[in-house]
Amino acid sequence: MVKTVIVGAGAMGLSAAHYALRAGHEVDVVEADSRPGGMAAHFDFDGLSLERFYHFVCKADATTFALMKELGVADKMRWRATSMAYWVDGRIYRWGDPIALLRFPKLDPLSKFRTGLQMFLTTRRTSFDDLENVSTRQWIEAGSGRRVFDLLWRRLLALKFHQYADDVSAAWVATRIKRVGTSRRSMFQEELGYIEGGSDTLVAALVASIERQGGRIHLATPAQRIASEGGRVVGVQAGGRFFPAEAVISTVPTPYVSRLAPDLSETAKAAYDSIRNIGVVCVVHKLTRSVTPHFWLNIVDETMGIPGIVEFSNLRPTPEPIVYVPYYMPTDHAKFAASDESFVAESFGCLQRINPALADADRLASHVGRLRHAQPLCEPGFAAKIPPIRTAIAGLQIADTCFYYPEDRGVSESARLAKEVAQAIGTDYQPRRRPAFGR
């Protein structure tokens, strides 16, 4: 039995605690927030328990299904036929299946063929190594053509990554395409999943498992320092207390690592500091009527300041329509400091443009959530920038969402990597970053 402290009670931290306890270790989890779950946590939205940031499940998420089975909540998995679309030149066009592609009037036949072929081949990939040093722009232009990139991709990347738009890894984008593109009922019908009761069902089951196995979760207990002596971890200072430990797993965003683990070498700290992140301001609206019939609407419109909307109620049934409008941007962007009211007004104005039948009275409630480190910036060659999970300080492992690369953030990757780091406790094993689709 190894006395272990896990820093962070998000999906990865809670999963790591669950697996570590199953392996017979003693576990304390320290979390700065007053609630567990991280990005998967719920909040009370005008009487509805809802995720702070939207989540959905794909059929490739095998680790999620295995974890739910272990926790006794596999029966809470639900599947629903969904669709995505594009807003182009003031109109909505269905997207994501062969018929929709053939009917799309904004592309010539050759561009349609090249796009369909590139997307199809991407869903059949088992490795993304050849895309590691290629940008998304280079990859799309080479496969689908410049016209396709300019029409369907340029604006989306610009609004999510801003000045870094031309510096986004093709491997990262391709794995996202594969994950969603293989979650289908048939060639003509996308099918995505949700957990009944939302992600809080899984979070609550993890918390119950941890407590049942004798683990302890300390909320509102921010970690101040990971302490070491003689090159070995000895504990964590958190919330004014010291938690002795023979092993520590840090799951907090990499920008915090240098401050949290000052005993790391300057070279190691520089490696964590070099990983850039962008923030998000996520607006959620509760409405009296639906905006569109689609789950996901990409917006490529120079006159709109949003890259898309997620009509979550078109996946998980809710009493009233629920729409997420995410604004991704670097935290030093001037707009990040704008008021909640301005984001609510702008985003609802966009919804009214998409569906002119929406009146001001149709907005029942709105909520604005912010994260400073929501999305790692995965540039070409990003894999070489990611430090090893096991550090030079014996007993200390460090991983956050960027370690899922080329996979994107998600519960399934959180659980997969959490199992790896938990199995490595008390050993010299270096956990693998290899994602579900291989590298």
Feature roles, as predicted:
Residues 46-128:
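Dinucleotide-binding Rossmann-like beta1-alpha1 core, especially the glycine-rich loop
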Residues 12, 35, 255:
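Conserved Rossmann-like nucleotide-cofactor binding loop
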Residues 324, 388-407, 413, 417:
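Short FAD-binding loop at a beta-strand-to-alpha-helix junction that anchors the flavin cofactor
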Residues 21-45:
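Glycine-rich FAD pyrophosphate-binding loop
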Residues 2-29:
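N-terminal Rossmann-like FAD-binding beta1-loop-alpha1 element of flavoenzymes
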Residues 107, 115-226, 251:
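Active-site/ligand-binding neighborhood in enzyme catalytic cores
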Residues 414-433:
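Internal hydrophobic alpha-helix adjacent to the cofactor/substrate pocket in enzyme cavities
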Residues 23, 222-358, 369, 383-392, ...:
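Mid-domain catalytic core of redox enzymes
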